[in-house]
Amino acid sequence: MAKYDKADIERRMAGAVESLKSDLSGLRTGRANTSLLDPVVVEVYGAMMPLNQVATVNAPEPRMLAVQVWDKANVSAVEKGITKANLGLNPMTDGQTVRLPMPDLTEERRKELAKLAGQYAEKAKIAIRNVRRDGMEDLKADEKAKDISEDDRKRMEDEVQKLTDKYVAEADSAAEAKEKEIMTQ
């Protein structure tokens, strides 16, 4: 039984790029974006929950996020979760609504965020290369088990390498676009 599965390898590489794009969407630029609060977790009812399970997030103004907490008892926990997420936001409470004005990004903070985007991209590229390594190992195991010939293994290794190059390039371009967005806002 052959271990190598090209579709699985491509799916896992695409997953790494999607994860990168999700991470990058959480990086703050100058504008209010509800996805900025996606990584925020809140300690409520004795458990850690994503913010979107205890409140609604919207952007009423271009430079303001509003978090409408469903249960008034959770307002302080939501504030604490936002502060702990270290997003550089200063929550202001107004009843059951937590308002988050978007401060202007300093040049120093822009550089930090651009560097963080690069780190996220590197993490994604490592994941892609790990998938590549798994695929190459599966091909060698298939050849050893006489499921495929040496020529087939080499041809399939080339396919895996092409997929790797494609997804690494996608990761690079996503990170470059985010870095450009951060530095020009």
Swiss-Prot record:
A Pfam family the protein falls into: RRF
Location in the cell: Cytoplasm
Annotated GO CC locations: cytosol
Keywords for the protein's UniProt record, in alphabetical order: Cytoplasm, Protein biosynthesis
InterPro entries (alphabetical): Ribosome_recyc_fac (IPR002661), Ribosome_recyc_fac_dom (IPR023584), RRF_sf (IPR036191)
GO biological process: cytoplasmic translational termination
Stretch list, region Disordered: 137-159
GO molecular function: ribosomal large subunit binding
UniProt cross-references to NCBIfam families, sorted A to Z: frr (TIGR00496)
Functional note: Responsible for the release of ribosomes from messenger RNA at the termination of protein biosynthesis. May increase the efficiency of translation by recycling ribosomes from one round of translation to another.
UniProt record similarity statement: Belongs to the RRF family.
Protein name from the UniProt record: Ribosome-recycling factor
Provenance organism: Erythrobacter litoralis (strain HTCC2594)
Taxonomic lineage from the root: Bacteria, Pseudomonadati, Pseudomonadota, Alphaproteobacteria, Sphingomonadales
